[in-house]
Amino acid sequence: MLGSAYSMYISAQEVTLKSTDLTVSIAENGFYRSIQVQNEELVETGHSPLITACVKGTLVQPEKLELKKNVLQLTMQDKNVITLSYSETPNCITLEATKVPAGYDAILFGPVKVNINEVVGDVVGVVQGRGVALGVQAMNIKTIAGIPDEYIKQVKDFYQCSGKSAELSVGSIPDYKLAAVDLPDGAAFLFSCRNRSRAEKRQVQQLQNMEVLPVKGADAAINGAKIALFGCSAEQALERIGAIEVEQGLPHPLFDGEWGKTARSAMCSYLITDFSEKNVDYVLDKSQIAGFKYIYHPGPFEDWGHFNWSKSFVEGGDDAVKALVDKASQRGISVGVHTLSNFTTTNDAYVTPVPSEHLLKQGRLELLMDINNSQNEISIKKTGLFALPMTLNAMMIDQELITYGEVKEEDDKMILKNCKRGAFGTVAASHGKKSPLYKLWDYPYKTLFPDLELQDKYVDRLTELFNKTGLKQISFDGLEGCSYTGQDDYAPARFVEQFYRGVGHNVLNDASRLSHFTWHVHTRMNWGEPWGEAMRTGQVENRIKNQNYFKRNLFPRMLGWFLIRLADKKFECSTMEDLEWALSESAGFDAGYAMNISVNTLKKHGQMDQLLTAIRNWDMLREKKCFTSEQMERLKDPSTEWHLEKESENLFSLYPLSITKHYHCSLGELQPGQPGGADWSISTPYAGKYAFRLKVEGEGYIENPKFVTEKGTIAFPCKVEEGQYLLYGFDGKAHVTDKNYNIIASVVPQGDAEVAAGDSHIAFACDKDEESAPDVTVRFITRGAPEKIHYQ
């Protein structure tokens, strides 16, 4: 504890704690009398307790506060006593529960209700308003954001703290799981710590009475639960959290000496591709064209659990991965890999041939008879464990795994039918009636889960392979699977912190879920998007929704994954216009992204190097903050289109584009004697030259297409066959290409035909194959005057 500037004093009515910009006064009944940040009063006297205890389904508040031997002693309504140690530093005030009655189920720090909510950082635990910020930070993984599940209704009803959930692309986070809840008249901070020392039956994944094993070690007890409170000006909130991390020993990842939450490199874009040791040189070549500093493999493992490497990735295990990583490092590129955290494949050695006793169990089933080693109908006592459909339908008895096909109820028993004995390569055996039969948790990915003890071994293996190989990026996908243990946000935080503490170098990382404590570890969040839509329509609203989530939680911004594809039955090959739409969104939101390009696409896309160069140019300008705030506002609008052109090393031109709808000409629907063609109405804000993308579909071909406007005629002496394109650019060059834009022939246009601004007409004509009648689809692109962007 520091000297007099931050020392605690006590009067007859209250205890006061101080830190820079923050003064906290606690009344003699154990309730907050005042919380002031820069002299702004943020609480109403007597509404927020220092601690609420959760005991046997009831809430117990404090009724008396005393200072004894430099600790705060709270006498609760049930006459039990909780002691809290405290500290005051320039950065924060900490409160740690040092003695909590063993019979308590959990404690809440507060809840603390405040009267500001201009910006509510619901996950990070920072509320801003009237120019100031108040924050609460958990100091360890046992102290979690939100309310224990069994006490949600009591707490929300009693303290009137129901508010907004956190909405993001992967789903919403309910208000009772948040660090700070946005309320109609302010906000509420919610932090808790539960007693994890005993085996319990809890609700897990919508199932009641699931088996939850006790936690071993110091994390099991409520003693040690700890928070930090801080106050500052709103613009200093992020900086203050960084200082608290360093001071209090929280995770504080650095990128080249700079904190990850402020480093520009935290929002760097990266390449996702299915490279291997056999083609990594080619992938590195392409990565350097795009300026990517990270390449990331989406599926390098043969199994999840032991995390053995797939032979299609490398053939020499960890040593071969290290050689690959070293090769990339010599070219300034880091390598990352994808995991599904604690998801466990059924080919892993923790499952087969002898399953680990630490596979995660839902609960125990009671056999009604002995079973032999081939019996495929098994009778058990009736249970509620089958209320939620599973995927693998796996059970464990002794050293055998069994799967069932269906469940039939008969009176007070259930019959498991179509059982597969010795499932997943285990050995079928006979078992006595009293042998424990366990129903296992699984996931729709056809995976199982470990309990916490086995989960730790998964992390040990991941830290081992990262330390040994030098890998520098990981995605903790499926991190929510850790919560299947019944240990809420503690379980994923344990996974992430153990990995962070165990790896000897900084690892850029993201995850499928962001929680309060893992905020300190994760570099950023970056979710994959479904590939069932075109790039510019794939979850646009969700991508934008995520930006608001990142901003209010003081977190590096990412736009998600984008896919560059080859042509298939449903989609055309990705275009430069599609890509630059995504890149302009990235520039507008100042958010990184992942570009998913398979090695096959890298090789077969005819414009790949141009696309990669565009990525490099846009990212260079974004990373150096070369776009003005006014330009960024326009760029982030998803209805706008843009093209960036490099003029010199330090000068770029940014063109606004107008891209028309698709115009169609069905050559099979012409009247007798009518020449092939169509008349189209076009509307564009930009006059002058245009580019276009013409595609021929259906049987046959066209020849000599031409376009006529009120300003002239332009013709293209060429033949375009089924599935081919005629591409015409603003540079005056035209090419016939295949479906993936590989050039088949270059074409010299004849004439010129500019368009006028506003509404006008374009006439299309062509010669066609007399024996067939293909369809022609055309999309026109016009552009406005460029804005000059200087790279510095």
Question: What residues fall within each predicted segment?
Answer:
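Aromatic-lined carbohydrate-binding/catalytic grooves of carbohydrate-active enzymes
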Residues: D256-R364, W441-V459, T463, T469-G486, ...
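Carbohydrate-binding surfaces of carbohydrate-active enzymes
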Residues: V321-T345, Y350, H358-L365, E585, ...
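Extended Gly/Ser/Thr-rich low-complexity repeat segments
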Residues: N29, I82-C92, D105-V120, L385-E400, ...
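Intrinsically disordered, low-complexity segments enriched in serine, threonine, and glycine
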Residues: R421-A429, K433, T684-Q792
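Autoprocessing Asn-cyclization modules and mimics
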Residues: S341-A428
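Carbohydrate-recognition beta-sandwich/jelly-roll modules
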Residues: L17-I295, K327, S334-V335, K472-Q473, ...
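Glycine-rich, aromatic-flanked loop segments that form ligand/cofactor-binding clefts
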Residues: Q236-F255, Q288-Y296, A320-G363, G432-K433, ...
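Glycan-recognition surfaces
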Residues: T346, Y350-R364, L440-K457, Y500-L602
